[in-house]
């Protein structure tokens, strides 16, 4: 930045105003001496003044940003997100290369339900700071909310690489595989999570059991579900899954299946499908009347056309 100095422009004024040639010659004779002394000190002083001015400007900018940040925090605390957005935009006008400001604005955009804008800010944040853990976390959560499990998985994997101490991320990695129906990788990921997070063993077993159930590995699925059973023994879905596993074992345990499916029905979980499965179990235990009652329930209450077709076929056979 240039500064006006009334004294140090002496030679410049002589030249620009085109003084008489005699004066110019006199000055030119003095130049070697002046360049070695006066001009050297002048440059040093100018550099020192510039550094002091720069430091002063930086301090002023820092104070302005700190004040704006305090105001921003107050606005967020008051849930005045629109005004807070104006304030963070002001901060970005002061420092457009600050990844933390983009991250804060992304958080505000989430609160304002502007998901696309939030993702754009998070992308910018991570271009500026590829190691910013919180930005990956928020972007992964937004991806999951939009059922974009592939990108969520990539962000969770990056998070774990950045900070392996945050082992709970392993559960999110496994869940992303599961949501994409990549059950084998999900099972492996849950195994890794279980080793790292023994305090969540039961919850991990339940989730892994669902994956194994989906691959029709009913024996291993049953073992996982039973690990979780004591946590919530009245849960309708859990009882349905356990009952269905017993029913589908190579050597089906139909009495056990009936017991768990009955609990699921009483809990109101998928009563039509649970009744159908229990009806099948009743047939295997020679209780045709009870089976027929369950199948009639399915016909009266189910909205699943394929399930009703299968049920009607069984009822027709029972009537023969």
Outline where the language-model segments fall.
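Alpha-helical segment of the N-proximal tetratricopeptide repeat
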Residues: 58-100, 104-111, 141, 175
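Residue-level recognition of tetratricopeptide repeat
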Residues: 98, 132, 166, 200-201, ...
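Register position in tetratricopeptide repeats
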Residues: 77, 111-112, 145-146, 179-180, ...
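Canonical positions in the second alpha-helix
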Residues: 90-91, 124-125, 158-159, 192-194, ...
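Structural marker of alpha-solenoid helical repeat scaffolds
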Residues: 94, 128, 162, 196-197, ...
